[in-house]
């Protein structure tokens, strides 16, 4: 349906990262290969907070499959990291990273849904903080 409707963007990501749930992931990979998709978002692989060892190895396994799939596309094969902007600000610089931001409007100001909403930090401030690290 997607292709018949004329859509041309052949990149997959998902709300709430459901594409890394194994039951969805295993079916989705067949769809991606068989219908000409070019890339899929990585599972979050850099976090400033601790995650369980099981979750860590699971994400490594999933990302290994996603790196392999994405290696076919000139743009997405370069992406090595997927992380939140707070992780990016706290940790060392990462080349070739996709940074997750969830824009929302709060009191007329565009910010990130994970930002401290009492700090009046707008999305431009967040982007400027990130660009200072480059």
Which residue stretches match the model-derived regions?
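Short, internal active-site loops enriched in acidic
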Residues: 15-19
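Terminal accessory/targeting
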Residues: 1-11, 21-134
């Amino acid at each position: 349906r997607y292709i018949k409707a004329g859509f041309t963007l052949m990149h997959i990501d998902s709300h709430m990262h459901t594409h890394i749930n194994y039951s969805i992931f295993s079916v989705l990979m067949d769809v991606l290969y068989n219908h000409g998709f070019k890339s899929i978002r990585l599972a979050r692989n850099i976090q400033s907070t601790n995650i369980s060892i099981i979750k860590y190895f699971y994400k490594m396994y999933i990302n290994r499959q996603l790196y392999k799939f994405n290696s076919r596309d000139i743009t997405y094969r370069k992406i090595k990291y997927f992380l939140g902007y707070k992780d990016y600000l706290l940790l060392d610089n990462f080349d070739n990273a996709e940074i997750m931001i969830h824009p929302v409007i709060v009191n007329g100001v565009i910010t990130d849904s994970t930002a401290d909403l009492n700090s009046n930090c707008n999305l431009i401030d967040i982007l400027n903080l990130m660009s200072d690290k480059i």
